[in-house]
Structure formats: C-alpha cells, structure tokens
Amino acid sequence: MSYPTLRLHPRKEESVLRFHPWIFSGAIATFSAPVEDGDLVSVVDSKGRPLGTGYFGGGSIAVRLLSFDAEEIIDRAFYKRRLEAALRLRLSCNLIRPVDSSDSPNTTYRLVHGEGDSLPGLIIDIYDRTAVVQAHSLGMHQVRQTIAEVLWEVFAEAGDPVLPLEGVYYKSETTLPTRDMRELTSDGFLIGHTEAAPIYENGVRFTPDWLKGQKTGFFIDQRDNRALVAHYAKGRTVLNAFCYTGGFSIYALHAGAKRVDSLDSSAKAMYLTEQHVALNFGADCPRHHSVTEDAFDYLERMPEGEYDLIILDPPAFAKHRKVLRNALIGYRKINSIAFKKVAPGGIVFTFSCSQAVSKEEFRLAVFTAAAASGRKVRILHQLTQPVDHPINIYHPEGEYLKGLVLYVE
C-alpha cells in the first residue's frame, strides 16, 4: 500500500535513523501530495531512501512514526501485532494477577503507553474487565473502532490470567491536540458496557472513574511508588499532599501508619479519597483525616515536626517549556517547606509528573530547597514510572515521572 510521501531536508533523517519516532515540522522539505491531519504518510530522506511510516499531524510534531520498516502495512493486523506484544510485556512482568491469585491481586495496569509500546499517540489502561482507550493524535482517533475491536479479540484469545473484556471505553475529549479535533469526538463505549467497580492494585482496592476522573480514571503510574510508601509508613504520622484519589494514603494505612492526613484543595478529591478509605477500612477509620485546603497554605501554617513522612505529588506545574521557570519555583517552594517542617529522621517523597521538566532540573530544584532548609538531607531512592509505562530508549521524552525519596535529619 502506498501513502503520500514526505521528504526530509538533508541531514534531518539522523534522529529517525536512531529510531526516534518524532519528526518535527521544520525537518520536512516536500510532500508528494496534499496531506491532512491524521493521514498516514511514508517518510524518506533527502535522497529518497525510505525511513518509515506514520501519522501526520499539523503541529510542531509533524509525524509520529508507527514503523521504521517502510514495507510494513499499517492495517488491522499491524495493530493486533502491536497489542499482542504489549500484552506479552505485561505478562512477562507478572503484572496481571486475578483476584483468586495467591499473590496480591492486581487487576489494573497500562497496556499501551504510546511511544513506549511503539504506538505513539495511543494510551490504553485496563481496569479489570474494562479497557479505557485514549487518543492523543487524530490518526489514532480515526482508527479507534479498529483498535477497540482488535483489543477485544486479543483479550478473548489470551487465556489465563488475562480476563476477557466486557467493555472498551473511549476517553479522548480532553486529549486530542486541538479544539477542532476535540469537537469531533465524544467519550463513550466503543464495544460492550461496564459500570465502575472496585479494582485491585497490589491487593489494595480502588474504584476508577473513567467517566469523570482525570487521565483514564486513575493514576496507575504511581503504583510502585505507592508500594514504596507502604515500606516506610508503619508507625509514622503521614501527610499526603495533593492527594487526589488518596492512593498513597490507602497504602500508608494498610502498612500501619499511626495517622494519615490527606490534603487537597478539591472537595471532589477529598470525596474520592474518603470513598477509597471506606472501601478498604470501612466507614469509620480513626487513623485517617481529610483536609480540604490549598496545599501551599497548609504546608506554610502546619507546625514543625507534625509529620515524619510527607508525600508531595502535585499536578503538573509545567505542561510546556514556556512556563518552566514558574514550575521550578513551585517545586523549590513546596520542597523547601517540607524540608523545614518534617520531623527529624523524617522521610519526604517528592514527585514531578511534568514532561517539560527534566530529571536534572527537578533534582536541582529539590537540591536548592534542601540547601535553603539548612538541614542534612540524603537521597534514599530515585523514582520513575513503573514497567507498564515503559520508556523507549530511543525516545527519552517518554520518561515524564520523576521522584526522590529523601531522609531529613
């Protein structure tokens, strides 16, 4: 099958030859025919040598390459191969553990993580028997029904421990790159139907909200880091700032924390947290307290030594590099307060989910905050996203989640 051909300027093929899946608009010299957003295109170098095939987009990232094999046809069979490969990876990591598993059950995971699974522009999260599909490009939006059908087929054929799907929900109203694109779609089930129901994450229960929740309904990317919080939480007094659904709080309570305070400015977030506390511990859990307040204000006014484990997991302070300076100021500020206020011998978990902030920039912001506190601070762990959010080694931009665990004397 032939697609319109996009020819690059001289020497602009170097990143593609290193298997980077993005081609920027400034690298393009000519088109063999008119193309529109979402069209499949063949990419060649300045001498006409084939480089691969991908979806065209009108933004600064002009092409997201699906294949570096110019002969590979992008069809239903292509998507099935990619989804089967993604599922094999999750199975090889022992991520899929049903409720009757002798190990702690885990029925939620990310099946497709964009470039990390060689499907740029596509996210698929699994919540028990529900798959939530999210497109970040018009090309993926246009094949959403094909993806849903192939996904249904792959899960039906997989066998234990993979559960056949009962619903594939499409959630892209807020993720397509332009307003015009977003107006082309509405969220809803592509196949089947399910109702929100509790899932298991490492034996801990949560109820994702794919209808109204952020991302696809739950923050799966912090699973491993929540488990690490549990490792340190026993007997401690914990503050979970920017708690959203309360994931860190629930793990800390399960681990035997003396007290956990969940902090968020959103009343809806506090409702979700309290629902998850009740799901795991019943309607009355005297070790848990909810605080609905701006996190910066609360951190400023809380007494020194009140907590000996503080978790800082704010929303993205910078979605693009233009606001990077303000983001770094924000990271320095919250970490500086935490370092000053945490009890001696306390632990601080601090995170950035901003792709625009590099690992080095985040670490420098935390270092600056530590220096300003005047306390002795040591790094215990350097954190990132879990194995079901794989990072394509040729696409370092895929490493968006950064975290540090720090011991403060």
Regions found by a protein language model. Give the residues of each.
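Non-catalytic accessory regions of SAM-dependent methyltransferases
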Residues: 1-122, 126-128
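C-terminal catalytic and target-recognition region of SAM-dependent MTase-like enzymes
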Residues: 306, 333, 347-409
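S-adenosyl-L-methionine
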Residues: 268-311
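Conserved SAM-binding loop of SAM-dependent methyltransferases across substrates and taxa
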Residues: 245-258
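Mobile active-site "lid"/loop adjacent to the S-adenosyl-L-methionine
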Residues: 292, 308-337
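Non-catalytic substrate-recognition/targeting regions of SAM-dependent transferases
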Residues: 112-125, 141-219
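Conserved SAM-binding motif I beta-strand of class I
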Residues: 259-264
